[in-house]
Amino acid sequence: MRVTLFTAALAATSVSAYPGMKNTFSEIRARVDADGGGADNDDFDSAELIGDLATLDDSKLTPVGKTVKSILLGNDISPESTDVYVTSGKANNLAAKGTPACAADTCCIWKYIANDLQGVFKGKSGRCTDFARAAVRLGFHDAGGWSKFTGDFGGADGSIILAAEEMSRGENNGLQEIVAQTQVWYNQYKQFGIGMADLIQFSANVATVVCPLGPRIRTYVGRKDSSKPCPNDLLPPVTGSADFLIELFENKTIKPHGLTALIGAHTTSQQRFVDPSRAGDPQDSTPGVWDVKFYAETLGSAPARVFKFASDVVLAKDSRISAEFQAFAGSGGQAHWNQDYAREYIRLSLLGVNNINDLTDCSKALPAKTGSFVAPDQAAIDKWLATKDRVAKIADELRNGGNISSLINNVLGWLKGIFGWKY
């Protein structure tokens, strides 16, 4: 089985809608540039146009086309959205599901889908669940099956579910549960005209923002579905060298700084396949939280149970990536990373899409973001992180987004009493 970076890691309105959002995109960019880890369009920043935007004249661009083009070029426009539906009071602008008014609003049904997804993606602890991590991974794997050299197919087209062959590939092992759940959602909502490709990418963005501290990425619908399998061998292996991984992503129009941002999705993960004997071990000390601990702990020391991919370590040390890696780990790194990840994921989610200009912005259907978060059981997690013995119940409860306080105290107390285990 060929285990990939994302297989291993993730298997495991108006501004007034967010009054606490103090920094504008321009302010974030200015601070980042001053720190030397900025978004200047140099050789390490993604700025290549994709799909129909690569050939359309500016005079033919729709508002969506203009916005996406600006984001792809790295211009001064935020890849995050603050647009929302008002769902209560006299200002309510969300029509009832199944009504003509909802059918007339392309994004209306997506708000109801988002509500269903959020209930599955958010755990009792407030952290995101394994289904959320898997949804992000599914989005990566569907879109990632594309390269500039593979012809006019592949990419974000829903084929990872619609083409049965793709799920038989080892690189997609572990996605079976989220694929089955996504099929359930699709069967429930296809009567309203949704597409599988859109559902996969919408789910990934809902999952990202449901994870505490995650960005609220501009989200588009209207992709064309395909049942043609994507090309093989276009997903990144966890054992790849820095040169190999950087070239692989550059062939997807994603430059080293973009790759640096995307691998940060490992911050929520608990690996299962790279080392099955350590199944459930996280890649940083705050699993299920969309923070920058992954960058700091990959670069430096980390608790005993934190599992580092060899490929992440070699990338962190590469001269084309190290400065950006350190910037994400440093002061102001969360806002910097969220913006860079959002921009790069928009690019990834549109690979192989040749009707970008005709898409609809449905960002207003996304859940609200969580701007601050303290895990209610972090003290218990810290105890668990300091140990190495595998206790499946603890790892599984974390994967489900549960609060492990009582569980870990009971389990570790029992181990101490029986074996004299110190913790």
Regions found by a protein language model. Give the residues of each.
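Catalytic cores of secreted/periplasmic or lumenal enzymes
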Residues: 18-423
